[in-house]
Structures are given as structure tokens and as C-alpha cells.
């Protein structure tokens, strides 16, 4: 099936009020497991690769693998660069064939975020590539363990300001906007408190498909309410990666207890199966199952 853009996926998700899962990948097992899950669920899907994961696998190495898998899939697939901040890397991803990129300028002042977003958007639009931007600070759990982030904060200082979001979309040409309303990257240590009223107002003022980052580990009700309030792309990685690791540990321990040998090809198969199972579960919650 031909590669699709984020804009195309968001158009259908907006019309039918569901969210498309964007799943970060770092190897072939994750790529194949996600595609298998999407095909089982008959769901559109976004294969996402984060700039921060380039030290694990070079962009030029993994891009052809992701793109080949996407084109061979029996469901619509967009290939997306996640949390791109380096303009050179963003441009390389587009040149390699990614159908969507995220420019993450959330750490910048509003005016500079707008300026740099427009720089990337101009190049992307010329190449037929969709663009996601970010406004507001999406935290890590308990400040994420990052030294520069503190545990106590005023939501108005870090969450997306609805009026700024309106200004941002009036001065940019993006296809989706990632917003901060209480989610955090990583696995949650305590139950997050999500500001759904803020999310609804952002949707009302911008009209854009909105993106949830830090989508791992929320309860089902939080996902559903977020989608009802305007979330159309839902990033999901940490919980999936954690589930795979737990599965591998359990399988290896079981084989060891039976004095059975384990081989790397066993681990590869177990990983793909664990990813597929988790992906199907999330797609049913996100409402994308059956939409392809």
C-alpha cells in the first residue's frame, strides 16, 4: 500500500473522531510487530522514529527498513520523525522519504518557535511532507528524572496556553499540534491529572488535530476523554517497550527453569509477538481499529 502522510491520516481521524497511534521504533522486531498489530486490527498507523534514538541506530540505516515495511503493509502507514530539533536531521529525514516530521520548538520562545516551525514547514510542504509542531512543555514523570526539571510546578507555566496556541496556528501552516495538558514522557509513577478543559479550549480555538505525547500507561478512560476533547494522534512507546522487556524476561526465565536453551531468534519472535499484542490492545482503545 502506498505511503500516506500524517495530514491524510488526521483528516480521516478528525472526521470520525478517533486517534491514530504513533509508535516509536528502534529495530526490526518493533517495526514488524507494529505492522502486524495494525493489520490484525485493520487500523491506520504511524511508524515513528525519534531523533533521540539516532545513537541507537543511524537514521540512514533504519529509514529504508521502516519505509519498506510501511509500503508492504496492508493498511495505511505514515512514517514520522519524532521530536526533531536539529534542522539538518529533519531535512535528512524528508530526503530519505519520511512522509511526516515533527519540529519540536516547545523549548523556544513563542516567536522563535513560530519562525523555526515556518522554516521547516516551507521545506516540508515543497516535498509533500506533513508537519507536526509542539507548544507547551510535556514533562517526564516526577520531572522525568531530568535534572533541569522540578517535581513541583505551576501548570500555567508549563501547559499549553490556549491563546498562544491560537496565535501559533494563525502564523504557521502545520498539520497537527502537540499540546501539554498533564501527560508526561516515560512510565508514570503516579496517576497524572489531566486538564481536559484546557484541551477542549485549545481544540476550540485552533481547530487543528491535536497530539498527545507521553501516551504510555494512562488508563482507558483518560485516553477516551482525550480523544473526545480533540486528540487525533497519540504517541506511545515507553509502555510498549516495558511490556516487551517483561515478556522477554519471563520467557528466558521459564526456559532456564526447564533447562531449555534460548536462542536469539526466539527472542526476536517473542519481541514481535509482544509488540503486536500490545499494539492491537491500544488500537481498540484509540478507536482506530477497523478504520483501515
Question: How should each PLM-predicted stretch be described?
Answer:
Residues 1-21:
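N-terminal amphipathic alpha-helix/helix-capping segment at the start of soluble metabolic enzymes
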Residues 219-292:
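C-terminal alpha-helical cap/extension of soluble enzyme domains
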Residues 15, 23, 179, 204-208, ...:
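Catalytic-site beta-strand/loop segments enriched in glycine and acidic/polar residues
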Residues 136, 215, 239:
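An acidic- and aromatic-residue-enriched active-site/binding cleft used to recognize and process polar
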Residues 18-26, 50-54, 266, 270:
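A short N-terminal beta->alpha junction/helix N-cap motif
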Residues 6-12, 28-53, 59-76, 84-205, ...:
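Alpha/beta enzyme core
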Residues 20-24, 79-80, 102, 210-213, ...:
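Short catalytic-loop micro-motif centered on adjacent basic/acidic residues
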Residues 182, 213-216:
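Glycine-rich beta-strand-to-loop/alpha-helix junction loops that act as flexible
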Amino acid at each position: 500500500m502506498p505511503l500516506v502522510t500524517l495530514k491524510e491520516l488526521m483528516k480521516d481521524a478528525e472526521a470520525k473522531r478517533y486517534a491514530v497511534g504513533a509508535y516509536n521504533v528502534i529495530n526490526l522486531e518493533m517495526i514488524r510487530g507494529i505492522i502486524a498489530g495494525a493489520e490484525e486490527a485493520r487500523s491506520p498507523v504511524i511508524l515513528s522514529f525519534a531523533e533521540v534514538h539516532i545513537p541507537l541506530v543511524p537514521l540512514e540505516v533504519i529509514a529504508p527498513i521502516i519505509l519498506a515495511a510501511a509500503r508492504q503493509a496492508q493498511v495505511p502507514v505514515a512514517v514520522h520523525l519524532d521530536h526533531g530539533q536539529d534542522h539538518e536531521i529533519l531535512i535528512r529525514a524528508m530526503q530519505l522519504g519520511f512522509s511526516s516530521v515533527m519540529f519540536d520548538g516547545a523549548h523556544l520562545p513563542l516567536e522563535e518557535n513560530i519562525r523555526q516551525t515556518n522554516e521547516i514547514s516551507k521545506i516540508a510542504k515543497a516535498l509533500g511532507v506533513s508537519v507536526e509542531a509542539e507548544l507547551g512543555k510535556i514533562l517526564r514523570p516526577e520531572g522525568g528524572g531530568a535534572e533541569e526539571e522540578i517535581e513541583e510546578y505551576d501548570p500555567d507555566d508549563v501547559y499549553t496556553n490556549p491563546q498562544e496556541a491560537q496565535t501559533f496556528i494563525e502564523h504557521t501552516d502545520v498539520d497537527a499540534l502537540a499540546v501539554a495538558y498533564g501527560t508526561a514522557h516515560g512510565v508514570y509513577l503516579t496517576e497524572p491529572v489531566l486538564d481536559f478543559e484546557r484541551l477542549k479550549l485549545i481544540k476550540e480555538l485552533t481547530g487543528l488535530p491535536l497530539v498527545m505525547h507521553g501516551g504510555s500507561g494512562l488508563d482507558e478512560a483518560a485516553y477516551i476523554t482525550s480523544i473526545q476533547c480533540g486528540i487525533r494522534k497519540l504517541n506511545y512507546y515507553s509502555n510498549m517497550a516495558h511490556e516487551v522487556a517483561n515478556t522477554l524476561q519471563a520467557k528466558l526465565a521459564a526456559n532456564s527453569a526447564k533447562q531449555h536453551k534460548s536462542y536469539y531468534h526466539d527472542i526476536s519472535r517473542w519481541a514481535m509477538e509482544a509488540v503486536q499484542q500490545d499494539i492491537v490492545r491500544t488500537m481498540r482503545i484509540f478507536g482506530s481499529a477497523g478504520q483501515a
